[in-house]
């Protein structure tokens, strides 16, 4: 299939249905049949984190303002200019229903968001025995950077399963799910230790796939190619 949509279109979180309809029709015209469908990711995430024991305040402080959501969804940035309002979340759910209906009418296979391991700070504080990794990105202060679960944490599969289940409960069955754990971020290991690098990548890959399949055994994991170009010297 031909995948469409760029994760980092800065103004796309502000698109209304009229703008989205034009975009979807344009993608169809160019033969795109696997468009990204990440609208309302935060509304689904909020439901998951509530089920994992966080309160609304702990969850809301995790999200950025709308303009920065593409980077939040890739695990690069938290909190910046946030939070998101209840009205925003509700509107995004309604918009995503319209988007998915149109995509499916045109025979497209939407790529939905899946869990990549990034967790709110409130979750970190509730689980002091878990060895979270604190990532860095773009020169932002540490308070805005992501915490990521280790691949051997039992929470990973539990949370990943909930993400898929909550998404499909709201939007219907889906096949393709996007998850990227290290977009423009260094792996938390010695760069010279190739054995450790490949081992960690394999562990995250296996855990991400298992977490998606736990929610939908027929799901297909999709990942972006950008990371492999941006960090080619390290990942080669």
Feature roles, as predicted:
Residues 1:
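N-terminal carbohydrate-binding accessory modules
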Residues 5-6, 10-236:
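Aromatic-lined carbohydrate-binding surfaces of glycoside hydrolases
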């Amino acid at each position: 299939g031909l995948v469409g949509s760029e994760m980092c279109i800065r103004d796309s979180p502000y698109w209304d249905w009229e703008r989205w309809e034009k975009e979807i029709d344009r993608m169809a015209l160019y033969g795109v049949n696997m468009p990204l469908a990440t609208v309302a990711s935060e509304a689904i995430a909020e439901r998951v984190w509530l089920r994992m024991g966080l309160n609304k305040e702990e969850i809301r402080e995790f999200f950025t303002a709308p303009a920065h959501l593409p980077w939040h969804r890739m695990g690069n940035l938290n909190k910046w200019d946030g939070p998101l309002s209840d009205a925003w979340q509700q509107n995004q759910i309604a918009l995503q229903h319209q988007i998915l209906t149109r995509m499916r009418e045109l025979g497209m296979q939407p790529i939905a968001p899946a869990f990549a391991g990034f967790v709110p700070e409130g979750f970190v504080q509730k689980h002091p025995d878990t060895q979270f990794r604190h990532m860095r990105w773009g020169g932002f202060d540490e308070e805005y950077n992501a915490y990521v679960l280790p691949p051997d944490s039992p929470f990973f599969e539990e949370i990943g399963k909930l993400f898929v289940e909550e998404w499909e409960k709201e939007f219907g069955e889906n096949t393709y799910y996007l998850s990227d754990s290290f977009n423009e971020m260094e792996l938390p290991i010695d760069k010279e230790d190739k054995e450790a690098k490949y081992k960690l990548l394999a562990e995250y890959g296996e855990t991400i796939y298992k977490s998606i399949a736990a929610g939908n055994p027929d799901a297909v994991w999709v990942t972006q190619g950008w990371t492999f170009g941006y960090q080619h010297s390290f990942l080669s």
